[in-house]
Amino acid sequence: MSPLLQPLDLTQCKASFEVEPHDEHPRVLEHIFLTITHPLRRSKRVAHQPIPIAWLTAFRIRPYAANAEFLAIMDSESDELQQFGATLFDRYGKIKSTLVDGRKGNGCWGPELNRQDIIYIMDVEVEPNVCVSSFDWSMFLHDFGVF
């Protein structure tokens, strides 16, 4: 295996984590930014400072906190979130009954979505030539209290 593609020891990775309330809808949406660094990947220009090897951006969504504005809030953020919201929820942020009905539902959604936060991952980026095939993002999100 090429030295550039050697798997990194993921136990040595460090995570920096930021949660920022949304400017317009802080009760319903929070931005999540997760950056992963590894001690073997250092900048040659800035005093050997660790450089990021991977990034994750996501939203924490609280549908239950939106009152009757859930779909409008999702629509104001992005087309992707609007489509997600309109597919699964009503305007009050409640999961559509057709998805949880025992006879009609698909069996993987339940009424617990009416009172739980949702982590919607928007983007994951990994530096080229970094082998992180077994990288467990949820490990870092859990460590920082997101899950």
Language-model features: locations:
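Non-catalytic substrate-recognition and accessory regions of acyl/acetyltransferase enzymes
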Residues: 1-131, 142-147
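Hydrophobic positions on the alpha1 helix immediately C-terminal to the Walker A/P-loop
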Residues: 139
